Amino acid sequence: MAEYCDIYNEAGTHLGTALRSECHGNPALIHCTAHVVVIHPENGMVLLQKRRMDKDIQPGRWDTAVGGHLAAGESFEEAARRELSEELGVSGRVELFHLFDSRIRNEIESENVRVFGAKLSGPFDFQRSEIDEVRFFSAAELTDPANRQNFTPNLCTELDELIRSGFIRS
């Protein structure tokens, strides 16, 4: 089944829809994604997912625990909750809190990203068709340059914002 995303101009005006597959590979198609930073409620560690080696983009690298494109007509929060369920098997009542918004612009795609936080400890029934592994990382591990070589560029940008805002203390 074809998946469609709403597309926007730089000013945020809705222009229509495009196939999700078209949004990757065409940076002119600005679309939206929702990410969820999962924080362990007891120790503050941050959950990351390791992308499968057969992924088209950033295979085998550590990434934000939850992230996905908004389907056409879907809100950021609806997408975040859907992705929590699909990627980590988490459903039901989960408190999401807004952390920040960002823009990702590169040669592959252009995304407007809303980043939420959620305090969860697991267990997680992660989506094995997309994810090889999930695990919690300490602040020291998240800021270690040796580890960052194995993180996606988007994750590094997100972590830098979380550190800058004091949400993660290095």
Regions picked out by a protein language model, each given a short descriptive name:
Residues 3, 32-34, 66, 112, ...:
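Residues that flank catalytic or metal-binding motifs in active/ligand-binding sites
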